[in-house]
From Swiss-Prot:
It comes from Geobacter sp. (strain M21). Cell wall formation. PROSITE patterns: ATP_GRASP, DALA_DALA_LIGASE_1. Pfam families: Dala_Dala_lig_C, Dala_Dala_lig_N. This is D-alanine--D-alanine ligase. Its EC number is 6.3.2.4. PANTHER family: D-ALANINE--D-ALANINE LIGASE, D-ALANINE--D-ALANINE LIGASE B. Mg(2+) 1 binds at residues 253, 266.
Length: 305
């Protein structure tokens, strides 16, 4: 849609929600809403709950800018509702969203696309556990973001505690072989890589606190990689985005080893849009302001089914 068309429409910024990433989503939504209002759009914020259909109808929303993170927002649930209501929305559609948030399902797609993954095993609640990979390993819920419930296990005595923590958030969890490498994240806009940023967390890894605490991690843009490796991680980011059928934008996370191997971790279909978020920072490095980023995402709003 053109800017002129969009300025005639009522835009609902969906934020908050019911997931463990609620507070982050509120920050993303407030930043997006403020940007839209500054740019002259008729925008209103909606804190998403189970009354969302009623709220959308009350506000007479004609377009939805989704600034939700985690379950019931990033997993295809809200996208399906918007499809049913006929309200164009930003970001990826139902299927791509559902695949991306499910680390187990997405790994099957990534492997079939020839992308490099860390060795992993799946454990479901109630199953007998037998470790398939040598320590250290990374334990994580299958369907959470922002490193919620994630832990690194180096000592066998800490394994059960890590499993219990991950199972607090999901009935299925992943146990991945630990990859010693740089944390590199690729920003995608309109299906093309904008650049790659390197994350150097102050703690053991890039956990929730490091992501959302000012000074919790150092961001290096562009990532400190040899030219050939930098180009390869951008290509793999685009490939992962396309493999899931993502629409418009995403952030793709990698671990890059000293030998230049790029291990894909996940694709985030609704990356953070806060002051500390990586996609806006990567976009800024490509000469795209926050307002321009918001506008380009909004212009791509559509029904996908």
């Amino acid at each position: 849609m053109t800017v002129e068309e969009l300025k005639k429409k009522k835009i609902a910024v969906l934020m908050g929600g019911l997931s463990a990433e609620r507070e982050v989503s509120l920050n993303s939504g407030k930043a997006v809403l403020a940007s839209l209002v500054r740019q002259g759009f008729q925008a209103v914020g909606i804190d998403v709950g189970r009354d969302l259909p009623q709220r959308l109808a009350e506000e007479k929303a004609e377009v939805a800018f989704i600034a939700l993170h985690g379950r019931f927002g990033e997993d295809g649930s809200v996208q399906g509702l918007l499809e049913l209501m006929g309200i164009p929305y930003t970001g990826s559609g139902v299927l791509a969203s559902a695949l991306a948030i499910d680390k187990i399902a997405s790994k099957v797609i990534f492997a079939s696309a020839g992308l490099t993954l860390a060795p992993y095993q799946v454990l479901r609640r109630g199953e007998e556990f037998k470790l398939a990979n040598p320590l250290p390993v990374v334990v994580k819920p299958s369907r959470e973001g922002s490193s919620v419930g994630v832990g690194i296990v180096r000592d066998p005595s800490r394994m059960q505690a890590a499993l219990d923590e991950a199972f607090r958030y999901d009935s299925e969890i992943l146990i991945e072989g630990f990859i010693d490498g740089r944390e590199v994240q690729v920003g995608i806009l309109d299906g093309k890589a904008l650049g790659a940023i390197e994350i150097v967390p102050k703690g053991e890894f890039y956990d929730y606190e490091a992501k959302y605490t000012d000074g919790g991690a150092q961001h290096i843009l562009p990532a400190r990689l040899p030219e050939a490796v930098y180009g390869e991680v951008l290509r793999q980011g685009e490939k992962a985005h396309a493999a899931l059928g993502c629409d418009c934008y995403s952030r793709v996370d990698f671990l890059v080893t000293e030998t230049g191997d790029c291990f894909l971790l996940e694709v985030n279909t609704l990356p953070g849009m806060t002051d500390l978020s990586l996609l806006p920072e990567i976009a800024g490095g490509a000469g795209i302001t926050f307002g321009e980023l918001v506008l380009r995402i909004l212009q791509a709003a559509s029904l996908k089914i």
